[in-house]
């Protein structure tokens, strides 16, 4: 009895109605601790019912409900609101479909942003609301200076171009190598041959020059010779043989082996200025443009493997080719690209 009085005095029965489970809960099972005492169900004020219990079913008969406050027919104002809401909904759905079609790339299905069924509803709702706001702002304040969105393809043409540009790159330098097939005394060559330089602390080769053809050779002690400065393949071969004959006259058993063209450099002018910034942005996979370090754009073509130095004035330098045909092919492939980025 003391416990019942304690509950009646200090506890509010309405609080228990929301916070405590009913007396039939597992807390009052025989397995509960001994210091927990069940409430007396005989007292109506101490019988609790939990709001977590069975949910009452809503009545299906609405005949007793007062619906007199609802109008029988729509007024003219309500009709106008309904028509306006339908128009706004149709406009938003049309803008959303138009926005989805613009984001979907025509050539690459599945790439880019699109509102597909796999995206979450939250993402779709955010994107749709953002699109509606942006379309509303753009319709209110149109921008006449906005540039059209153009699909940019960063692919170098691999197929030969049928139309000829009419520009032929001119060879400026041909680098070749040869093997004299014997060991050489570089000090002896430097002391007895004309037009030579030799500083072993600076460079471990003899630098020799001849006037015809006007070239320079690097002669190493292993017998390797590098000839540079020739304007054609034939001039490079002739110059390499002349260097071998000079060394042979100094008493070395020289033989001329393994002549090979290692690099060819050519240049030309397309006669129009080029927008290097946009070209570098479009063909970023193949080009490198750092105007603070070098004023030209470095374009590395895949096929043929030729490096082009493109300047804003329209001058083009081609290097890295080992045959003359590679230079012509690389320039003919590059010329249509340069025309598309001509400054107007």
From Swiss-Prot:
Q: Which residues form the signal peptide?
A: none
What stretch or stretches form a coiled coil here?
A: none
Provide the function of this protein.
Transcription factor required in complex with TAF3 for the differentiation of myoblasts into myocytes. The complex replaces TFIID at specific promoters at an early stage in the differentiation process.
Protein name listed in UniProt = TATA box-binding protein-like 2
The principal localisation class reads cytoplasm
Concerning InterPro entries, the annotation shows: TBP, TBP_CS, TBP_dom_sf, TBP_eukaryotic
- Subunit structure, as described in the record: Interacts with TAF3.
Q: Where in the cell is it found?
A: Cytoplasm; Nucleus
Q: Name the domain of life.
A: Eukaryota
Q: Where are the compositionally biased (Low complexity) regions?
A: 110-120
Gene Ontology BP annotations:
DNA-templated transcription initiation
Q: Which organism is it from?
A: Rattus norvegicus
Cellular component GO terms, alphabetically? cytoplasm; female germ cell nucleus; nucleus
Please provide the record's keywords in A-Z order: Cytoplasm, Developmental protein, DNA-binding, Nucleus, Transcription, Transcription regulation
Keyword rRNA-binding set for record = no
What would be an example GO MF term here?
A: RNA polymerase II general transcription initiation factor activity
Residue ranges of the region described as Disordered: 78-143
State the family it belongs to.
Answer: Belongs to the TBP family.
Sequence ranges of Polar residues compositional bias: 134-143
């Amino acid at each position: 009895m003391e416990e019942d009085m304690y509950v009646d005095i200090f506890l509010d029965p309405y609080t228990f109605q929301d916070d405590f489970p009913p007396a039939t809960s597992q807390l009052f099972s025989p397995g509960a601790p001994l210091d927990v005492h069940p409430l007396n169900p005989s007292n109506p004020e101490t019988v609790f019912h939990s709001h977590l219990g069975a949910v009452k079913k809503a009545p299906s008969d609405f005949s007793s409900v007062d619906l007199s406050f609802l109008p029988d027919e729509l007024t003219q104002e309500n009709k106008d609101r309904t028509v306006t809401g339908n128009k706004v909904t149709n406009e938003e759905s049309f803008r959303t479909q138009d926005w989805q079609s613009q984001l979907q790339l025509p050539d690459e299905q599945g790439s880019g942003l699109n509102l597909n069924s796999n995206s979450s509803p939250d993402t779709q709702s955010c994107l749709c609301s953002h699109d509606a706001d942006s379309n509303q702002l753009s319709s209110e304040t149109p921008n006449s200076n906005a540039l059209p969105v153009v699909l940019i393809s960063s692919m170098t043409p691999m197929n030969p171009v049928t139309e000829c540009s009419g520009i032929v790159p001119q060879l400026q330098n041909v680098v070749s190598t040869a093997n004299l097939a014997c060991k050489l005394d570089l000090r002896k060559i430097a002391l007895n041959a004309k037009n030579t330089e030799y500083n072993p602390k600076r460079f471990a080769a003899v630098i020799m020059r001849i006037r015809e053809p006007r070239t320079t050779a690097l002669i190493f002690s292993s017998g390797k010779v590098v000839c540079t400065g020739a304007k054609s393949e034939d001039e490079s071969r002739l110059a390499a043989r002349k260097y071998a004959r000079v060394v042979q006259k100094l008493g070395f058993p020289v033989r001329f082996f393994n002549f090979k063209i290692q690099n060819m450099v050519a240049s030309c002018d397309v006669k129009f200025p080029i927008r290097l910034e946009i070209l570098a942005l479009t063909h970023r996979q193949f080009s490198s443009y750092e105007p603070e370090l070098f004023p030209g754009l470095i374009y590395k073509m895949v096929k043929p493997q030729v490096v082009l130095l493109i300047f804003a004035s329209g001058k083009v330098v081609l290097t890295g080719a080992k045959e003359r045909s590679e230079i012509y092919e690389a320039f003919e492939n590059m010329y249509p690209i340069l025309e598309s980025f001509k400054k107007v």
